[in-house]
Amino acid sequence: MGIKFTKMHGLGNDFIVLDGVNQSIQLTVEQIQKLANRHTGIGFDQCLLIESSQTEGIDFNYRIFNADGQEVGQCGNGARCIALFARYYGLTAKNKLTVATKTTLMDLIINEDNSVSVNMGVPRLAPGEIPLLADRQSPEYSLELNNGNTVNLHAISVGNPHAVLLVENIDTAPVNSLGQQISFHPQFPEQVNVGFMQIVNHEKINLRVYERGCGETIACGSGAVAAAAIARLFYNLSDKITVHLPGGDLCIQWPCPTAPIILTGPAAFVYEGTLLS
């Protein structure tokens, strides 16, 4: 008998979701890489695994694997899918869940319209918490690239590391070429997700994201949170920001720098299947 899976997406950021509560699942890095292949596998940006938790106050463990097979600590779009998955398949009857990832705890609320709000915690700017190799915390950092040029960027952690660059037009931003250079830069010892942010007005930004281990995706929840936090902190944007990504819009609310930042958006089921090998 193979492993049952469900294909889901959040604004086109696509996943396979695996029920590790009712199935015994142990996937290797190589197996995840094969499944992620869009020609010879299923194809996805991340593989999400929900497991039982033995810790009081935590409903489930939420594990996230990038397409390269590496486990990471945060995925906001995936969290929305996990919440709907858990309720749809009867793993819980609750509308408010707490899940534990590799690096953090997340509170998830299923709203009446089936959108999901995700408490992404308080963003962190200290270099050691991102992690970023830097002598001191700064609003902006300069990175020297392989070609000798330098690029200025902001750096932040929202449960996973993000670099955010301000650009005039995201349509012409070199997301893949520059994003890859920054993602693998030695100053980011765990690699980094790279957001290219265009400010539209006081309440809206446009965003494209190069995700570590995936490349550019058409939506990135944690990337939207990171960019909105940077926009609020350093560019005086509103405490409620609409982030427009190629896959659609997310709403980010952050009342003050010491409060948790909240991500709200949709999640969708696509199909069910069985992994045969």
Swiss-Prot record:
Q: Which Pfam families match?
A: DAP_epimerase
Tell me yes or no: is Flavoprotein among this UniProt entry's keywords. Answer: no
List, alphabetically, the InterPro entries matched: DAP_epimerase_DapF
Q: Which reaction does it catalyse?
A: (2S,6S)-2,6-diaminopimelate = meso-2,6-diaminopimelate
Residue(s) at site: Important for dimerization: Y271
Q: What is its EC number?
A: 5.1.1.7
Q: In which pathway does it act?
A: Amino-acid biosynthesis; L-lysine biosynthesis via DAP pathway; DL-2,6-diaminopimelate from LL-2,6-diaminopimelate: step 1/1
List UniProt keywords, sorted A-Z: Amino-acid biosynthesis, Cytoplasm, Isomerase, Lysine biosynthesis
Positions of substrate binding: N13, Q46, N66, G76, N77, N160, N193, E211, R212, G221, S222
**Which molecular function GO terms apply here?**
diaminopimelate epimerase activity
From the Swiss-Prot or TrEMBL record, state where the protein is found. Answer: Cytoplasm
Q: What does this protein do?
A: Catalyzes the stereoinversion of LL-2,6-diaminopimelate (L,L-DAP) to meso-diaminopimelate (meso-DAP), a precursor of L-lysine and an essential component of the bacterial peptidoglycan.
Query: Family per UniProt?
Result: Belongs to the diaminopimelate epimerase family.
User: NCBIfam families per the record?
Assistant: DapF
| Assembly with partners or alone | Homodimer.
Its protein name is: Diaminopimelate epimerase
* Species, as recorded: Legionella pneumophila (strain Corby)
Q: Name the encoding gene, please.
A: dapF
